[in-house]
């Protein structure tokens, strides 16, 4: 096992009682993370740091509350001569041909000063090095002395910072399978607040797959010791109300109000301190200042928007850095309601739209899962695998102009409302659209009626046909169920 000195930042600014509480939470999280992945770890507080003895340092990079850490070598040394000798044995070859600097921190009473230590170690290594550089050396040598223990290290590895997860109150976070919402959730977790998660499904269970993939990435890397509760709201009825029947005037904004209302109900019934969203000011039509005001009007719990001042490029960079950037995307579900986006709505406009929404029906469709149970439940895959089934009815959901420009041979162009109402249960249907979300919705609705249906995208089917014609894939048709 190796030894690591773990540093925190804000915890050290707390009063004694709160500091002790947060230190305990941090150490508990460290031990649990290692235990869950099958490794050993022990830790204790030492002079404003956490000393961790563990099998490797992988988890330390991902535990909220850790500002930085260093692999350290610990020795017992009572005199300046002992400290200098040990430092020379460790670092003489490491500094050969390189510039270096020495930094010493001490806790306790000693017969020498920190400056004495720095000078003595520097003198002992100087002749083997390329010289001393106290501004930007090739290697910094650190000697932290606590009583008669000396800790040597030369690496400082950054952690995520923030506060220990679980040290602040919990929130319910709105998460999709996209880029923004997992980042906003991570940012609140970094501030010490556990987040349970709400997903509003418009093509249940198809759109759960990319959502679960992103959540698992977030949890497995950053909080395997505190897995979230997942709430899934079946919102497929909104497609008929808002898109097919067109009963709402401000659909792109009203849809967000609906999600807020669902989250509010969950928050009030389960003791969450507020709602976390991935909205950024002005990024899309529903996120103008006026629309954000209209969306949250009447919501009775606080709403946190960690990304409010961030550019999209900044969010994408952070998603890649924290490992939640989605490999595949069906498109943001909000795009279904954005054919005529409204950029400046008023609260009373959305209040009027909400009269068309049966919120009680949506509330009844909320289900709660553990993330592992939800993963097991998603065994049914409605996406098309292999070739198009023989004699399948191919439905193109794109606009008429897109269909006339190019389409899959033998496909028929149908609007969303007609596609979900096909009558021939003896046929197999392959439904495609631009991003895969509308086709996934239709496939899930047809499956609910006992009709065999698969979904895909126009680009994916074009690629499959091209590969088939070139002989890169077999021409065997996928059998119908």
Curated annotation (Swiss-Prot):
Subcellular location: Cytoplasm
Domain THUMP, residue spans: 54-156
Keywords on record: ATP-binding, Cytoplasm, Disulfide bond, Nucleotide-binding, Redox-active center, RNA-binding, Thiamine biosynthesis, Transferase, tRNA-binding
Active site, UniProt feature: 433 (cysteine persulfide intermediate)
Biological or metabolic pathway of the protein: Cofactor biosynthesis; thiamine diphosphate biosynthesis
Domain Rhodanese: from-to ranges: 388-463
Amino acids binding ATP: 174-175, 256, 278, 287
GO biological process, one term: thiazole biosynthetic process
EC number: 2.8.1.4
Gene3D superfamilies in alphabetical order: 3.30.2130.30, HUPs, Rhodanese-like domain
Catalytic reaction list: [ThiI sulfur-carrier protein]-S-sulfanyl-L-cysteine + a uridine in tRNA + 2 reduced [2Fe-2S]-[ferredoxin] + ATP + H(+) = [ThiI sulfur-carrier protein]-L-cysteine + a 4-thiouridine in tRNA + 2 oxidized [2Fe-2S]-[ferredoxin] + AMP + diphosphate; [ThiS sulfur-carrier protein]-C-terminal Gly-Gly-AMP + S-sulfanyl-L-cysteinyl-[cysteine desulfurase] + AH2 = [ThiS sulfur-carrier protein]-C-terminal-Gly-aminoethanethioate + L-cysteinyl-[cysteine desulfurase] + A + AMP + 2 H(+)
CDD domains hit by this protein: PPase_ThiI, RHOD, THUMP_ThiI
Annotated S-S bridges: 334-433
One GO cellular component term: cytosol
Function statement: Catalyzes the ATP-dependent transfer of a sulfur to tRNA to produce 4-thiouridine in position 8 of tRNAs, which functions as a near-UV photosensor. Also catalyzes the transfer of sulfur to the sulfur carrier protein ThiS, forming ThiS-thiocarboxylate. This is a step in the synthesis of thiazole, in the thiamine biosynthesis pathway. The sulfur is donated as persulfide by IscS.
Entry protein name: tRNA sulfurtransferase
Source species: Thermoplasma acidophilum (strain ATCC 25905 / DSM 1728 / JCM 9062 / NBRC 15155 / AMRC-C165)
Lineage of source species: Archaea, Methanobacteriati, Thermoplasmatota, Thermoplasmata, Thermoplasmatales
Gene transcribed to yield this protein: thiI
């Amino acid at each position: 096992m190796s030894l690591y000195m773990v540093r925190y930042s804000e915890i050290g600014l707390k009063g004694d009682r709160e500091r002790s509480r947060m230190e305990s939470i941090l150490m508990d999280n460290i031990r649990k993370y290692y235990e869950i992945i099958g490794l050993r770890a022990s830790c204790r507080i030492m002079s404003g740091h956490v000393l961790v003895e563990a099998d490797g340092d992988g988890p330390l990079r991902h535990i909220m509350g850790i500002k930085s850490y260093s692999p350290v070598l610990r020795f017992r040394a009572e005199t300046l001569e002992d400290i200098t000798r040990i430092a020379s044995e460790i670092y003489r070859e490491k500094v050969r041909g390189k510039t270096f600097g020495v930094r010493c921190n001490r806790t306790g009473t000693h017969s020498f000063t920190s400056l004495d230590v720095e000078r003595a170690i520097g003198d002992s290594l100087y002749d083997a090095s390329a010289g001393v550089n106290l501004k930007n050396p090739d290697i910094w040598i650190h000697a932290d002395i606590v009583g008669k223990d000396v800790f040597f290290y030369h690496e400082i590895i950054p952690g995520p910072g923030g506060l220990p997860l679980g040290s602040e109150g919990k929130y319910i976070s709105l998460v999709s399978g996209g880029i923004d919402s997992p980042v906003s959730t991570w940012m609140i977790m970094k501030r010490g607040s556990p987040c349970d998660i709400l997903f509003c499904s418009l093509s249940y269970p198809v759109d759960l797959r990319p959502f679960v993939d992103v959540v698992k990435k977030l949890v497995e890397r950053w909080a395997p010791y505190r897995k979230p509760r997942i709430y899934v709201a079946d919102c497929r009825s909104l497609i008929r109300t808002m898109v097919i029947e067109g009963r709402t005037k401000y659909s792109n904004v009203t849809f967000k109000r609906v999600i807020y209302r669902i989250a509010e109900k969950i928050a009030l019934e389960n003791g969450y301190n507020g709602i976390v969203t991935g909205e950024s000011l002005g990024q899309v039509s529903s996120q103008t200042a006026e629309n954000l005001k209209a969306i949250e009007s009447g919501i009775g719990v606080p709403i946190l928007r960690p990304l409010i001042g961030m550019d999209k490029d900044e969010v994408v960079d952070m998603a890649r850095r924290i490992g939640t950037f989605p490999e595949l995307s069906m498109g943001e579900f909000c795009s279904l309601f954005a054919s005529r986006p409204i950029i400046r709505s008023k609260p009373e406009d959305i209040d009027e739209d909400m009269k068309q929404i049966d919120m009680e029906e949506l509330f009844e469709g909320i289900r709660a899962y553990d993330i592992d149970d939800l993963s097991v439940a998603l065994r049914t895959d409605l996406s098309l695998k292999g070739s198009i089934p023989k004699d399948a009815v191919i439905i193109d959901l794109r606009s008429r102009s897109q269909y006339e420009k190019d389409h899959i041979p033998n496909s028929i162009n149908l609007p969303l409302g007609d596609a979900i109402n096909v009558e021939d249960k003896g046929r197999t249907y392959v439904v495609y659209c631009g991003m895969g979300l509308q086709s996934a919705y239709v496939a899930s609705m047809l499956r609910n009626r006992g009709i065999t249906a698969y979904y895909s995208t126009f680009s994916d089917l074009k690629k499959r046909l091209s590969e088939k014609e070139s002989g890169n894939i077999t021409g065997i048709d996928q059998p119908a169920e």
